[in-house]
Amino acid sequence: MDIEILSLIKPDIVLFIGDISDGSIKIIKKINLINIPSFVILGNHDRGKDSSGDTLIKQIRVLGEKYCAWDLNIFNNQINILSARPCSSGGGYYLSKEVKAVYGPISEQDSVKKFLKSSEKNIQNLPLIFMAHSGPSGLGSDPNSICGKDWKEPYCDWGDRDLAIAISEIQKTRKIDLVIFGHMHNRLKRNQGFRKMFKIDKKGTVYLNSAIVPRYKTNSKGELFVNFSWVEFVENKIKHISHRWYSESGEICEEEILF
């Protein structure tokens, strides 16, 4: 259904921010059927619980140039897309056995250096998007904070430190327009309500959590809807951000406008 709806709504690019397949190559292969420029960072569930790293490597090979990790892509000379640490599970800094098997024992400091090295290639007069699976630390420690731990006490900031440090360093030399991520589900555990999914910092950087879970739902008539986060840039500036529910015909049936 996702492929069909994307062909109807026709975004300029599609960003996948992880937890796509639980390591299933069959699902990952479907991304290559999308005839829209796509960029993919894998999430902690995509590691496949395979400490050899083979499952992760297979996904990386299938995705080819669509795969993003610690690097910068410049799309159509229109936008910079900087990618974060792959397969992050949040909680400060943690490198899983699967990621170590593929990339080696990368320290938090090394991860920051990789971000900053890649960011040097950005085109200054173009917008910069930082895409990650888990968001950065420093955005709140309440259970409903945009990256707040909600599933058990003590509640705390569950964002990635290396990402936060890199953002702070890059902001010294240029604006980061958007940091987009997922991982932390919108619906909180223990019936605590819903998470804050949007934030703007003092530097004007927008933080968007796209983890609307589940992404599919039906209405009282049995009609199926699917969720996408939608961002529009006009003249190199963000003009619109929303969480949208689309029908199978590509119509917007529900929309939560965030900006």
Predicted segments — roles?
Residues 1, 21-25, 45-52, 88-94, ...:
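Active-site environment of divalent metal-dependent phosphoester hydrolases
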Residues 1-34, 47-49:
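N-terminal active-site segment of His-dependent metallophosphoesterases
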Residues 50-72:
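Glycine/small-residue-rich loop that forms an oxyanion/phosphate-binding "nest" at active or ligand-binding sites
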Residues 69-91, 123-129, 199-206, 236-240:
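Beta-strand-turn-beta hairpins that frame and shape the catalytic cleft
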Residues 126-175:
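Active-site-proximal segments of metal-dependent phosphoesterases and phosphodiesterases across multiple
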